[in-house]
Every structure is written in structure tokens, then in C-alpha cells.
Amino acid sequence: MNSNLLVLPILLPLLCALVLVFTKEKNRLSKILYIGTMSVNTVISLCLLIYVLQHKPITLDFGGWAAPYGIQFLGDSLSLVMVTVASFVVTLIMSYGFGRGEDRVNRYYLPTFILFLTTGVIGSFLTSDLFNLYVMFEIMLLASFVLVTLGQSVEQLRAAIIYVVLNIVGSWLFLLGIGLLYKTVGTLNFSQVALRLDQIHDNKAIIIISIVFIVAFGSKAALVLFMWLPKAYAVLNTELAALFAALMTKVGAYALIRFFTLLFDQHTGVTHPLLVFMSCITMLIGAFGVIAYRDIKKVASYQVILSIGFVILGLGSNTFAGVHGAIFYLANDIIVKTMLFFIIGSLVYMSGYREYKYLCGLAKKEPFFGVAFVVMIFAIGGVPPFSGFPGKVLIFQGAIENGNFIGLALMIITSLLAMYSLFRILFIMYFGDNDGEQVDFNPLPKHRKTILGILVAVVLAMGIAAPVVMNATENATKLNMDDNYFHSIVNSHLKEGNK
């Protein structure tokens, strides 16, 4: 396969975003462009993933400049799983909204900046060096800053200030980590960094750099440093809340998985217990949040925080099963959290309220939502045969192999609390008493029900056909847990380029 195809998943959304600037007045044409572009992007990413699973990873050196001197993209099973899932959910998100009922500014500019954000996300998954990872993070964050602040309410502006400030601090830490690492090893290419870190005997320097990256990426993933997330997500409209929940924290978690399996595996006795500790704190924060709030958007926001704790617990176990579970659960959670925020946003749209006490009788009026809600709860809880089950079982196994029984117990307890918080909403939807206050539910557009139906089908399919998905995530785990395998791929490519 031509390695130049690897640039398409990032190039298509970028070009489409630029074209939309000139077609914003033509709503129908714009919709065809951005939905069509992301649909094609999903198909291309899936084809690249299938090729990689059947053959070998793809590397692309831009301008013919071989790494570590040039910009390099790496399409392996981990990056392409994430790119495929991300492209798929962005397609659904952009199909879900932005109709004539939207505010003029939102209708004109949201799709453009969503595509810019998608460009940064996909670039973060594909890049093979730290500086370009930083560049992609900044593209993603700048677009997200616009999306968060593109509102007219005081509540949204307040949430935007917190979001922007904390993410800028995280970016500074990321840049600081890059500077310290370059000073230590003299390169930023992933494979070169991995090789040279193994030769460094200054343990304190490596540990300090590792901790800087943990905090930097942890702030992006809402790992302990969660303050920006609930307020920001709660004030966004349905499409943006789903987009942020699906992708923003996942990029930080992806970076942690890449760094602490491929690069910083020299001092696992320090870094990985820290990751486990932070994951446990994050799970507790998420659990308290889902129980404490009656605002269903904030309940959903804390569900995002809780799931990040699960992913990092698997990574922190430093076992094959744990890392495999983290990767599977991360990919699955992109889809499940999209579904969660679509459902929550639809409930707010139909009832006009964010507190679940106003949802009394809705499930009886809209039985489809009752079914979709149950599927979502079981997927989040990791109940077989739903899609959350394989990932959680592997994370459980990793925690047991690592002897981390406290983390295991916390994961079980917080998973039950997560399910309880959602069953509480479901119970109100079926059996709640509105105490005489009648709420007239607005009908949900048919195309939005169709998209929810697609997500329900995908969640069920990922659970039932889990071995197919696990083939890709297991391959990704082998790649990231085996330094020699990764180096042999990159080095063989470099030799071919020098011939």
C-alpha cells in the first residue's frame, strides 16, 4: 500500500474545514460536504486499519526527510483503531445537529471548527514525534477554545474561562516536558527517544520528565485535574458535549498509553504506581460526582471522568492484560460516551430541563429511549454481552496480576455506582411522579433517533463480536509493549529510505 494514503485521514477534514468557510451560507451543500467527508474518512481509516492488521504498520516521511529529521506519521493498529473510531463518531455527531433551528453563528461556524478539532485529534493519533504531537494538541485545543466560547450565556463564558486557563497550563507543562526530554536525549522521534532513554543513566532526570508528562497529559485527560470538565461539558449543546466527551479526554489518555508503554518504561516502580494512585483518585471523584448531582448533564460529565480512571488503572498495572483492557476500553468509550451525551442531550431537548425529576413518564411516551438507555447503562457498567465487558475484564485481570486489589475493588464499586446513577434516571423516566407538575415533551427529530439506533447497534455489535475488535486491540498492545518490535518496524523503513 502507498504510504502517502496515511495523510488522507488528517488532510480530508482539514480541507473540508477550509472549504466550509466559503459555503457557510449554503446550508444543504455544507451538510453534504462535512458529512460526506467524514464518512469517506471513516472508510479510508478502516481500510488502512485492515491493511495494517494483515501486513505491517505504515510509516510516512513528509517531504522525503527521514526521521528523526523530518515529520513522520505512523499508522499502526493502535493509532488507526483510534482514528477509525474517532472519524466514525464525528460523522454521527455532525449528522446529529446543525439544522435550521440552530443559532446562526453556531450553524455557520461550528462544523468548521469541529473539523479543525478533528484534524488535531487525528494528527495526535498519527504523529510519531513529540513536537508534532504538541502541534496537533494545540490545533485541537485552539479549535476547542473557539467551540467552548462560541456561546451567548454567562454560564458558558465562565466555564470557558476555567477550561481555557487549565488547558493552557497543561500545554505549558507539555512544552516543558518536551524541552527537558530534548535536552536529555537530543531527539523527539518516538523510536529514537525510546532507544536513547534506555541508554540514559540519570534516573532522576527521567523520573522528573516522566512526572511532568503524567501531569501534562493527565490535565488533558481529566486525570485528577478534572475541574474544567463538568462545568464546560454541562453548558455545551448536545453535539459539542458529545464531541468533547468522545475525543478530548481520550487524546490525553492515548498519549499516556503511548508514552508509558513505548517510551517511559525504565522506572515502572515509580511512574506506574503514580498512575494507579491517580486513577483511583479519579474513580472516586467520578463516583462522587455521578451520585451527588441531579443535573443529568453533570452526571454524564462525571461519567467521563470515571471512565478515564478505568483506562489509566489498566495502564498502571503494567501487564499485557491491563494495557490491552485499557486500549479496548478507550476505543469503546469513545462510542459509548457519544451515545451517553446524545441520549442525555435528547432528554434535555424533549423535556426542556436538565434535572432528572422532570423526566417522569418520558420512557413510556418514548419506549425507544428506555431501550437505548438500558443498553447504554449495561455498556458503561461492563455487563456481558455489551461492549464494555471485554475491556473491564482485561483491566480486572491486569489489576489482579499486578496485585492491585485496592484499585480492583474501587473499579467494581465505582462501576456499580455509575450504573446506579443512571438506573436512578431510568427509574424516574418510567415510574417517577411529577407531583402534579405536567411537562410537555417535545418530539425528537427522526434522524436523531436513527443515529441513536446506529449507536445502540454498534455497542451491541462490539460486545457480541468482541473477538474481532480484540484482534486489533491485542495487536496494538503487542506493538506498544514490545520495544524491539516497534524499533524493527521504524528502522527497516529508514533503511529502505536510504537505499
Curated annotation (Swiss-Prot):
Question: What InterPro entries does UniProt report for this protein, alphabetically?
Answer: CPA3_Na-H_Antiporter_D (IPR050586), NADH_UbQ_OxRdtase (IPR003918), ND/Mrp_TM (IPR001750)
Q: Which residues cross the membrane?
A: 3-23, 32-52, 78-98, 108-128, 130-150, 161-181, 206-226, 240-260, 273-293, 308-328, 330-350, 368-388, 403-423, 450-470
Give the location in the cell. Cell membrane
Which biological process, per GO, is one annotated for this protein? ATP synthesis coupled electron transport
Subunit note: May form a heterooligomeric complex that consists of seven subunits: mnhA2, mnhB2, mnhC2, mnhD2, mnhE2, mnhF2 and mnhG2.
Indicate the family of this protein.
Belongs to the CPA3 antiporters (TC 2.A.63) subunit D family.
Protein name, entry field:
Putative antiporter subunit mnhD2
